[in-house]
Amino acid sequence: MQEKYLVSVIIPVYNSSLYLQDILDDVKKQTYKKLEIIVIDDGSSDNSLEIARENERTDQRIQVYSFQNGGQSRARNIGLRIAKGQFIRFIDADDRVPADSIENMLSPVANSDSIDMVIGNFISNSPYGLYSGNELENTEISDRQFAQLLLKTPRAFYFGAPWNKLYRADIIRENHILFDEGIAWCEDLLFNLEYYQCCKKIHILNCKNGVYQYFVRDTGATGGIKNNKVEEARIEEIRYQKLLEYFEQYDLQEELKLGWKYINFYYRLTNCVKRETGGRSLRKRYKTFAEMLTPEDAYEYICLRENDYDPRVHKMLKKAMEKKQIHRMFLIFLFKSWMASHFTKTMTFIRKHAHLRIPTDY
């Protein structure tokens, strides 16, 4: 590919010393070389800044900036103000990127000036059944077609996260689009919704290895916020209102309202089986769970949600609902919750200790 575009890669960093060198190596080894790599350290207390500085000394494309604890949104906004490229790519310091990621994402826009954004599929170690776009075909779609696609899974990382997308810098600058520094999570989706409203054509990209590898970490970064029910409710309301505002452009607000009911019902079921939110007693959690499934439309609620994320679980739930096996459904949700919690901690432990050797002299 002819390297006529400068791509600004923005990497916010905070206490990421375990993973930072890996992601910097990934970016430096991209098959597309015309990059401006902007690393924003947000007051790390480990040696992340030293790792970044060392890479800056050996690769002239890397620029390192250090600020004190402004949060990820502020770090990204600083990167946007510094960026000089025609295209913007966001990457998190604790994930990985395939070597051909940027080249693959640039290919559609290199052949068409009318494409405002490229969204690619990703690979994840998440046990949550994330919607990753792997089943979508390579295609160029209109803004209305995209809105209808987003409507199916409005809370999915595929649409909300910034790291699987290629943005046009002029659209961001001309429309003064920035990350909201006043909220601790969901700011990615709000940023994207503003950007989506400026798009006429979007290219859906599907690559064999994805354009990004997303790792779930047991960092607790938003745990404190999400345990604050008042703040969680405030942010949920902001998210809902922004989505409503977006879908009103296409007269799809009623579809969103209905879908939102399905989603909230599923999350209430998920929360009531958790020990930390549903109560210590398993009997009490089961009773609450069973009471929620008494309405006649409960089957439609639960199966619609699961079908979008995990077809295998959907089949089990459908079978259990048809036979009125509430206890079986409870066990499915309980197991999913347990797996999600322990998988994250286990994967974090493995990654942290991957460098250790197992003794063989025993």
Task: Enumerate the predicted regions with their spans.
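Cell-envelope/extracellular polymer assembly enzymes that use nucleotide-activated donors
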Residues: Y5-S8, E36, L190
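A conserved acidic beta->alpha catalytic loop
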Residues: D41-E50
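Donor-binding/catalytic cores of nucleotide-activated saccharide
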Residues: Q72, A93-E231
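Short aromatic/hydrophobic "clamp" motif used to bind/position activated sugar donors
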Residues: I88
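Membrane-interface aromatic/basic loop that binds lipid-linked glycans or pyrophosphate carriers
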Residues: R275-Y362
